[in-house]
Amino acid sequence: GYQYYSYLEDGDYNMEWWDPKGQTFFWRDDIYNTFYFQEGVNSIYTILSHTWKNLEAQAGVRGEHTHTVLRSSVEGADRTKNRFEFFPSVHLGYTFPNEHRLLASYSRRTTRPQLFYMEPYITYRDFYTAEIGNPDIRPEYINSFELNYRKNFGENTVSATAFHRYRKDKIERLRVPYSAGVTLDSMANVGHDYSTGIELSVSLHPVRWWNTTVNGNVYHYKVKNEQAAGGNTTSSTNYDILWNNLFNLGKYTRIQLDGSFVGPSVTTQGRTDAYWYANVAVRQQLCNRKLTATLAFRDIFRSAKYISDIQTADLRSLTRIKPKYPQITLTLSWTFNSFKAKSTQAKEDRSEMFEGIKH
């Protein structure tokens, strides 16, 4: 197969600054900048699969050519890049008697930097936090090895996955002193990180109108710093839990309730604290399923506190962020034509359906 992806953004950046003495805003002409960004990705891929009795094998490879152009009014910041890369994947599965299934897999993936990671000029989030992009930032590359066991009990499923993931050129936000009382943040390829652990998942269908899924991860996390900006090579034991519930209230009404707990973790410059949050969403379909209205509330208890503690040789920065209100979104969509089979529709009804529900 072949796939083409293109993204284009052309604009400028300016900022109004608050003058406490004059009690008015004024434009900061010294931080006015223009930018142009275009990215095109040409991809070709092939997948081969075969089954021998209870053994299934699948191998694939994806070749990508990525062309990016960055233009800016900042002198010396223009960049044109071309990359050609391969991303292989291999999956081997075996089904034992009584529906016991074992699957081993390997895949190589990438995460490309977003535009604001690369914008090469100073911006401000607030009076005390300045930011600057890095036009030379590179994509992340992830090599993932997994061994999964799965057992079905009717409509219920239990699975366990052992995994090891190695990420090269990890992208992370770094913070350094900038001026009196002001820090400067920038995105950088800080080095490599490693995650080795186990994921447990239980999916239950207790009654006709309720589906519930619990996922939990426990893994050893190590980040190997290769930057000189006060970073460290350190490790931690990380964990997270997600509980998702889907309620079918009639043919056209769905309610989704989920809660997550994310444990503390180390970073190259310090650590982040644990936090938890809960979301709820209601979806109503009207006009013979052509009109869909979704009302979603994210972090309904305002518990998703972000606490980051950065400690380097020349900086100590403690950041606490707590939301004042839940985030509320209302989404309306109209389906003009639907070619999906009924079996596909039923499958979607039991999956993640609500836009804006995940953090």
Identify the meaning behind each predicted range.
Residues 46-50, 90-94, 147-151, 162, ...:
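Residues on the lipid-exposed face of transmembrane beta-strands in outer-membrane beta-barrel proteins
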Residues 8-35, 79-83, 116-135, 171-189, ...:
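Surface-exposed loop/turn segments flanking beta-strands in extracellular/periplasmic regions
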Residues 26-32, 134, 138, 153, ...:
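Outer membrane beta-barrel strand-and-loop segments of large Gram-negative receptors
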Residues 4-8, 52-54, 63-69, 106-112, ...:
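Transmembrane beta-strands of outer-membrane beta-barrel pores
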Residues 39-75, 83-89, 98-144, 164-185, 209-220, 244-265, ...:
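Surface-exposed extracellular loop regions of Gram-negative outer-membrane beta-barrel proteins
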Residues 52-55, 95-99, 142, 152-156, ...:
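Outer-membrane beta-barrel channels and translocator barrels
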Residues 234-359:
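Conserved C-terminal beta-signal and adjacent last beta-strands/turns
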